[in-house]
Amino acid sequence: MKAKSYKLKYVPTVQQLRDAGFRPGGSWMHENAFMFAERRFAYELSVSICFFPDLGVWDDFYNILVLDEEFGQPYTPFYSENYKKDIKGFPVLEYCIRQYNDFLDSFDFLE
């Protein structure tokens, strides 16, 4: 199981973001966050994605946060030496990666 890399297929409009479930805010992810969407799932984890006011400025490291909700900090096993590497034998991390990929795959403006 490996976290995919994502980039913008096209720059979405504010209305397209709203239609995709984005809401204003997201400052816990980045001080310049303008709109965000998130998915919470088991094991007290969540995946959030944000856009800055310049919607074309986006990458899959600075604009996405996998958060350990219990401790209120980035989920370290996702980011540390495991970041975007093939993971086997760690069920919680594999589940997290699957949720990350499924959530980001749901947006038609990402590829």
PLM regions and their residue ranges:
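Amphipathic alpha-helical segments
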Residues: 3-26
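Intrinsically disordered, low-complexity regulatory regions enriched in serine/threonine/proline
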Residues: 1-5, 10, 31, 36, ...
